[in-house]
Amino acid sequence: GCSQKKAEPEVVKKEEVVVVDTGRDNFIDMERDRLAKQLKGELQTVKFDFDKFNIRKDMQPVVDTDARVLGGANLSGLNVKLEGNCDEWGSDEYNYALGLKRAKSVRDALNAKGVSANDFILISYGESNPVCTEHTKSCWAQNRRVDFDVIPQ
């Protein structure tokens, strides 16, 4: 027979699912991050003489290698920063201007090798970003440079 007791309906709690669209595809972001890190590891620093912004003869092979690395890469979605740096000699204003001239010099050399200027952000740190802080000629020489940074857009 039938029992007098009615079965209580099972209460199922609905969970609200919220989908957040960040406008970015995670796989593409991860691949872009991986490529940015790889490129940054392959690009070499360009060094400069005291108070100069022209590419030295001994740095031309470095620029050639950097041009090959950048020219062979899919830079879509990436920004390439050319970071000009100086030693501590000279005023802050002078060194910021010199650092920018160094970054432009590297950009122009890469352009001459067929790497597009649209892919570059030029920045000067002047003397504010030293890799060496000793007060020696060899240390100062290390600070006269253009570094590369590759970052996702």
Residue ranges and their predicted role:
Residues 62, 69, 105-112:
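Structural preference for long, well-ordered alpha-helical segments within the folded cores
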